[in-house]
Design a protein with these regions (language model features):
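Beta1/beta-strand and adjacent pyrophosphate-binding region of the FAD-binding site
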Residues: 2-14
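Helical element adjacent to the flavin cofactor pocket in flavoenzyme catalytic cores
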Residues: 134-185, 189
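Active-site substrate-recognition segment that forms the wall
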Residues: 14-25, 34, 42, 47, ...
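C-terminal catalytic lobe of FAD-dependent flavoproteins
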Residues: 275-348
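Dinucleotide-binding Rossmann-like beta1-alpha1 core, especially the glycine-rich loop
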Residues: 47-125, 130
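Short beta-strand to alpha-helix junction loop
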Residues: 56-68, 134-150, 250-254, 312
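Short hydrophobic core segments
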Residues: 7-9, 181-193, 318
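Helix-loop-beta segment of a Rossmann-like dinucleotide-binding subdomain
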Residues: 54, 82-92, 116-153, 163, ...
């Protein structure tokens, strides 16, 4: 029987972040995952962007999340080796004079994220921007596959990665057991693939489709408006569709058509579609992460619900989860599973 402080089940963005934070704290960690089952991180474009939505508002907790996003991935690169963190400006064309005026008079709270606001066409040779646009900073993309693979190999080189499927962890008074592994605590970071013991969690699968395209010329920046074009050398990832309900597994002609039309309305550069992918992102009813302890088994915990913003949410809340496990802090109310208190009624 091999003994560890922590067993992390699932190794997408959430599991990778948590496992690294615990390792940095000097704890023994074993990570268990079957990479072939990962349907979210494996197709993620990895974009992190402080400005979000049709109304171009600041993303939730941006002033806290984004500084730590930079700190975490740079440290992760030094730890596991390789390059997967790519800070890069994003250009968002304006859709109207009104939108242009709004951002020309943006207040000081936007200073950390606005590189430049232009009232005239800036990249008109590549995109449709008759009203100008804004160049955002403190943004970019993470090569998620490379990050996850590098983290997996780092733990594997230390004999702390197991390629297997887990759904039957046995809780005990002083920890948990699974096959030949005993750990003081287990944390499930399995996204939409919930084990039976956590089936009460309100994780909502959110389907997304992406395209892999080859452009006739290389875009100058990351372009983002209704659709994004993120480098995935030598190609680009275009995404993503957003289907919270009534979705079917697999890629669809409708998904491809939607992305192609949005891309054509944003970027003038001719392109060829090379591939199409789909995945399920774990969302929650209020679109906030979900951290906490099983109501019956105190040694069984979970870190889930990162949705469409996992690249920026995973580092910050992975650290918060690690602090909680190490008794160095609490899980804040906005992400604590206790906010869905009615889910616990059957355990009381």
């Amino acid at each position: 029987m091999k003994e560890y402080d922590y067993m992390v089940v699932g190794q997408g963005l959430a599991g990778s972040s948590l496992a690294l934070h615990l390792a940095w704290a000097g704890r023994s960690v074993v990570v268990v995952d079957q990479p072939a089952r990962n349907q979210s991180s494996s197709v993620a474009a990895g974009l992190f962007n402080p400005v979000t939505g049709k109304l171009l508002s600041k993303t939730w907790r941006a002033d806290e999340l984004f500084p730590y996003t930079f700190e975490f991935y740079q440290r992760a690169e030094r730890t596991v080796g390789g390059t997967f963190f790519h800070p890069k400006p994003i250009y968002r064309p304006f859709l109207s004079i009104e939108e242009q005026n709004q951002w020309m008079s943006a207040g000081p709270e936007w200073q950390p994220y606005l590189e430049r606001v232009s009232p005239t066409s800036t990249f008109g040779g590549q995109v449709y921007d008759p009203y100008g646009g804004m160049i955002l900073k403190s943004c970019g993309y993470v090569d998620v596959n490379r990050f996850v693979r590098g983290t997996r190999e780092w733990f594997g080189a230390r004999g702390s990665f197991v390629d297997d499927f887990v759904d039957d962890v046995q809780p005990m008074d002083q920890g948990v057991e699974w096959k030949n592994i005993r750990a003081k605590r287990v944390i499930f970071c399995t996204g939409c693939a919930l084990p039976p013991v956590l089936s009460f969690l309100p994780v909502r699968p959110l389907k997304g489709e992406t395209l892999t395209v080859k452009f006739a010329e290389r875009p100058n920046l990351i372009y983002n408006r209704a659709v994004y074009a993120v480098p995935a050398d030598p190609f680009y990832t275009i995404g993503a569709t957003y289907q919270p309900t009534k979705w079917v597994p697999g890629i669809t002609a409708e998904g491809r058509h939607e992305l192609e039309e949005k891309l054509k309305s944003l970027i003038k550069i001719p392109f060829v579609v090379m591939n199409q992918k789909w995945g399920l992102r774990p969302s929650t009813p209020d679109r906030r992460p979900m951290l906490g302890t099983h109501p019956k088994y105190s040694n069984m915990l979970f870190f889930n619900g990162l949705g469409t913003k996992g690249v920026s949410l995973a580092p910050f809340f992975g650290r918060q989860m690690a602090f909680f496990l190490e008794r160095m802090g609490q899980i804040e109310g906005s992400v604590n599973i206790n906010r869905f208190k009615t889910l616990y009624s059957k355990f009381e």
